[in-house]
Amino acid sequence: MTHVTTEVVSCRSDDGIDLAGALFLPDGKMSRTAIALFPGTGSEFYQPFFALICPVLAEAGYATLAMNRRDHGQFFGYYPLHDAAMDQGLGLDFLAARGAEQIVLGGHSYGTVTAPYYVAETDDPRVKALLLYAALGDLRRGSMLMAGGEAPYREMVRQAREKIAAGKGDEIYVNPPMVPGDMPLPHRYDIFLDKRGPESRAVPADLIRHVGDRPLLAIRDPADPFPATLPPAREQLEAANANLTYCLLEKRQPRTSRPSAHYFDGREPEIVALTLQWLAKLGLAPN
């Protein structure tokens, strides 16, 4: 039986930001193929979804790193997409320095934006495949639905542009929650436009067109109510890249949508099983 050891780790970016994470090792050793996972909006590396699946992936032989970007947790609205996405390279550097030869890069929710963004920007040869848990299609559309429709979204965009034109783009306001009952998050006006505005690049359906021939696995719970995961996200993603496998979990009772479904609450074993089956099919064995 594999014994999983856990290390709390920290990596420092070139501009001095410390990024924390947890490394799960099978029998205390690095595997040839490692997995690196990054969280979504408002989340941390220790979110329950990662805390439950990472040790099981390690039990299967894959050294697995769950790590923050600079825009983790309440910092989401303070840092631009590009800078945060590039932080993922620190996690890859860390795994490579420990002996990993190839890496499966993945993310949950907004992490399904930053993972393909990083690959599209760098074409990092260490990344052999991508995992998209609670895959988003287009965060711009999700933000419009969050705002309550096209008209209120246009007004939010207008206000942000007005603030930036007045030299006040770094002022803070509070964005509404993505779904009722979720947590509202503070945003700078300039970061709102960068991540959620009409010209934002936070569009996985576009980004995955630029990841080369790397295979991708996207998974969604049909009860997930988060706007950017809703149809036509699946259709957009599948049309964008023929190498993408999209898995929609079977419906469960109750059939009503619920925020916890975005985090695969109670369905973590299914996620691990789908992930391991896919990796085996690709021939990406741990060692």
What does each of the following model-derived ranges do?
Residues 1-29:
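N-terminal cap/lid segment of alpha/beta-hydrolase-fold proteins
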Residues 31-40:
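Short beta-strand element of the alpha/beta-hydrolase
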Residues 42-54, 69, 229-230:
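The serine-hydrolase catalytic nucleophile loop
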Residues 54-74:
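Conserved alpha/beta-hydrolase
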Residues 70-102:
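Catalytic nucleophile-loop/oxyanion-hole region of alpha/beta-hydrolase
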Residues 102-159, 190-191:
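Primarily recognizes the serine-hydrolase "nucleophile elbow" in alpha/beta-hydrolase
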Residues 163-272, 276-280:
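Serine-hydrolase catalytic core
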